[in-house]
Amino acid sequence: MPVLRDRIPRRGFFLGLALLAALSGCSSTDTFEQPVPVPEIEASVEFERVWSMSVGDGHDGDFLYLAPLVTGDLIYAASADGELYAVATETGEVAWESEFEDRIFSGLGGDGQNLYLTTENADLVALSREDGSEVWRTSLPTEVLSSPQSNGSLVVAQTTDGKVLGFSATDGEKLWQYDGSVPVLSMRAAAAPLVGGDVVIASFASGKLIALTAASGQPMWQYEVGQPQGRTELERLVDVTGQPLVIETAVMVVGYQGKLALVDIRTGQEIWSRKASSLYSPMIGGGQIYLAAADGEIIALRGSDRREVWTQDRLAWRQLTQPMVYEDYLVVGDFEGYLHALDREDGSLVGQREFDDEGIRVPAQRLANGNLLVFGNSGKMAVFQVKPQD
């Protein structure tokens, strides 16, 4: 979950948690809520570990979001202290490892040729997928915390102060820049942009979703996910920090203290919307929409009419990750490093495992072989199967 921008020392881990909890508890009524304790459950499913490893020092005490990149048979993972790994999805065998000289600030993006990351010194760096060697680097105006995205010819990075920049994937030449507006107070975060062949879609702390031409970065349309309301800057937060979800010719997007909406990707016209508040992208599966609300409730909506099917509140304020659909379950992580499995039919908690005592910020990922990839804040990385207990 993002934190308030420029209000937390990069090494202030415990201060960061306190401010994060305070933010999570702030609403139009300025209510502060403590995270509920880990719920006691009667588990009917288990997280069975297939393999595990350590990726450097993970986030190394910084409030980062170093999501691994999964492509085909390999997982590419990085730590803040510069450890890079390419790992076989099936066995966890290391294909190659590399020590990067700079401190890493973003998760990995990639295309058919390169991997992309950003550094603490605000550089965008391209690395070879074959061995992790540096291909090119270029300077960015300010820090980037979200993974750079590429369509094979264009690499796009979005800074925390609202700039979206396009670069040549071949040599890092800057091709264009779009300057978005940023309110006085915002999350120290930015959603990774969506990069297609002709269009780039980016979301902003101003509560806007904006489509840009991939060729020149010129705006095509914009959609208001949230409109600032209230008297205080906290009340007026409307950040969109989750990457929009593409569904055929539309994108689904959700904002903090805003709404959940489906928008035509060609025109920006709203197809439908409903009130919602979340910091992460929604997930869909089995005709339902799943959302981790800002207050820690997990909500299932019927896709056909967006009516609420169930709500799970036993993980309230536990700073959950984005839910991941896995077979008949939803999987989320939390700030104390627990993994939780929910039954998709009724939202009941059916499985639980303690994974990383430094917490889990990156959502689990479903691998092509059906297993589940989990990355913890300390750098623990593991693959699990979620299955009924014997």
UniProtKB/Swiss-Prot annotation:
Kindly list the residues that the UniProt entry marks as N-palmitoyl cysteine lipid attachment points: 26
Gene Ontology biological process terms in this record: Gram-negative-bacterium-type cell outer membrane assembly; protein insertion into membrane
| Family matches, as InterPro entries | BamB (IPR017687), PQQ_b-propeller_rpt (IPR018391), PQQ_rpt_dom (IPR002372), Quinoprotein_ADH-like_sf (IPR011047), WD40/YVTN_repeat-like_dom_sf (IPR015943)
GO cellular component terms attached to this protein's record: cell outer membrane
Q: Where is the signal peptide?
A: 1-25
Q: Where is the lipid attached (S-diacylglycerol cysteine)?
A: 26
Bilayer topology annotation: Lipid-anchor
A Pfam family annotated for this chain is PQQ_2
Q: Does the keyword RNA-binding apply?
A: no
Its primary localisation, in coarse terms, equals: membrane
User: Self-association or partners: how does it assemble?
Assistant: Part of the Bam complex.
Looking up HAMAP family in the UniProt record yields:
OM_assembly_BamB
Q: Which family does it belong to?
A: Belongs to the BamB family.
Q: Tell me the PANTHER family matching this sequence.
A: CELL SURFACE PROTEIN (PTHR34512), OUTER MEMBRANE PROTEIN ASSEMBLY FACTOR BAMB (PTHR34512:SF30)
This chain belongs to the protein called Outer membrane protein assembly factor BamB
Could you tell me which species this protein originates from? Marinobacter adhaerens (strain DSM 23420 / HP15)
